[in-house]
Amino acid sequence: MQSQRNKVVVHYSDGTLLKGYTHDFVPDKESFHLNTALEPGTGTIHEVEISDLKAVFFVKTIEGNSSYTEKRTFEEIDAKALHGIKIKVEFKDGEIMRGISLGYGKAKRGFFIVPIDPRSNNERIYVVASSTTKVAVGAEAEK
């Protein structure tokens, strides 16, 4: 059985970005492999250490849509369509991200969030907990 190729954009803690495909990302593992090829069978394979990352963005398209302005606050969307815990993540680099999480826990090494904007190019984001300065949940995430 062939494993699924996930389109990802890897954000390193130092600001470096890598785009490509992975078939072996597992949150509990220390690393995974990223193929930077846009075509199967080409490109470079990188071993990516989770501890070096800010986040892994699982995306709909590698290219994205630079002309689209993503909704970033809970007020901009239909809150009734959200299923999960509201979450606000503040990263060490100053970026603030809001979304929904089903598995956030303070003691975890990382957690997934789903963007609040259904039209976002991001399907889900794995946030590396050590890259954050603050995480707020529930009503606190709306501030």
Show the residue positions of the predicted features.
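Conserved RNA-binding domains used in RNP assembly and mRNA/RNA metabolism
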Residues: 1-143
